[in-house]
Each structure stands twice: as structure tokens, then as C-alpha cells.
């Protein structure tokens, strides 16, 4: 299969590309810079120059592919609404190019989009009002237009070497503050998945998933945030403390809105229906390997 991949040079995308190539697929990766293009060529992929802000270009690339994996997202924490709108336009453009073809379009979302405070499953509709909800709904709706569209919801912590997501930010904050913190009793849970396992799931969804389905890239149902704070405190040799919810923004900055989220997530249906078998280390074990603190 000739697969167009957006976000192909990102943390997850740079694992998805070799996963696809290793399974016999051809990859065309989206690159907006010379460095990105060089990285894709080195990985054995073709290059399509463009960006998420060019929906017409994305449509051309999708039209020339047998399938699409959409990983790119504008991670602008100052303007989530604008980032979500850009994502929606990209999905609509690529979906229109694939309409009536029954070709696969795999769209990325997050497990935190599901209702909070109970075990989330693949059948849960997204909670209203999040910046990714319109994108996920648009992707699932493409099934009615003859696109084999599906959604992969990534755990909040996709971890592994080179991670630059939430956990490295928690480590940075702990270094700056001289203490490793959690909110309240720290019992709220974040699911996790190793980068290599997430990449394998994207391939399986591309190859197998029926139209209009959602899948969960979550190896662990939920790691208590207090456990993360404790392992960070141990490695940095700083005290582990509780921060009241009303001080979350003051202590964690932009992460304050996420640090208290309780997002336990099941991937039972994903494993059963797609044969996904995560093999990477868990989040705490990955932290204990030490590379996050180099």
C-alpha cells in the first residue's frame, strides 16, 4: 500500500514510518522543512512538501495514495481552538479526496477526549467541547462518504526515547521548582503507551479497521499521577509534594489543565479485534531506565 503520512517526522510519526516500511508498504511523508525532508529520505520514504495550512496540497497527496495516516497537529497550547480548526480543515480536505474510494484514512485523537472519571472504552463518543471533538466526529462521519475512516486515540503519555510530551514537561517543572508535584491526592490516572506499540497500532488500523471505528492506543489503563511524581522525585532527588487544585495553573503552567485529569482507558476491544499486543515497557519502567533524566 502507498501510504501518505502527515506528521511523519514527529515523535510518533518517526516510529510509524519504519513500521510501515518494514511491513512492505511505501511511505510518502509530509515535510515542511529541508531537515524534515532529509529525515524522511534517510528513513526510506518519499517526500511531499507542504503543511497542514495547505489543505489543497494535502488533498493532492491523499488522492495519490492508497491510504492516509494523519498524525500532524499544531501543538499551540496558547490557541487550542485555532489548532483544532486547522486539523479539521486538513481532515475534511483529505477525506474529500478519498470519498467513494473505500481507501483508509486513520486520524489521530486522544483518550482524554472521552468522558472523564470512569473507564473509557472504544465505543465512547467524544466529550463535547474539546478542541479535537470536531475532528474526530468529522473523521467518523466520512464512513458515510465511502472512506474507510477510523480514529486512533493516543494515551496522554506516548513515551520512549526522544519524548517531548507531558512527562518531560513535568520533569522540567520539577527541576525548576525543586519539588515534584501532583494535584490533590494524586490518584487521578493517565494511561500510557510506548511509542513503538503506538506505531504498530497505527499500521494495524490502516490495514484492518472497518470504517467509522475508534481504537485506543493505551497499554496501561491508568498510572496514578502520584506514581509519576514519585519516580520523578526519586531520580531528581527532590521532595514529592501535593498541590491543591486551585494552585494547579500557578505550579504547572499550561499543564495545570491536564495534571488533574482522571483518564482511565481500556484498550480491550482494540487488542481483541486487531490483535494488538503491546511489548514495550510501561511508563514508570521507562522512566526508571533513566534516559528521561539525561
Language-model features: locations:
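N-terminal Rossmann NAD(P)H-binding glycine-rich loop of SDR-like oxidoreductase domains
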Residues: 3-23
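Conserved Rossmann-fold NAD(P)-dependent oxidoreductase catalytic core, especially the SDR/UDP-sugar
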Residues: 26-28, 74, 86-130, 150
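NAD(P)H-binding glycine-rich loop region in Rossmannoid oxidoreductase-like domains
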Residues: 29-92
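Glycine/proline-rich active-site loop of Rossmann-fold NAD(P)-dependent oxidoreductases
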Residues: 133, 159-169, 176-177, 204-215, ...
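Conserved beta-loop-beta element that borders a ligand/cofactor-binding pocket
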Residues: 137-161, 166
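A conserved pocket-lining segment of Rossmann-fold NAD(P)-dependent short-chain dehydrogenase/reductase
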Residues: 172-193
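Mid/C-terminal beta-alpha module of Rossmann-like enzyme folds, strongest
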Residues: 199-255
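Amphipathic terminal alpha-helices
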Residues: 281-294
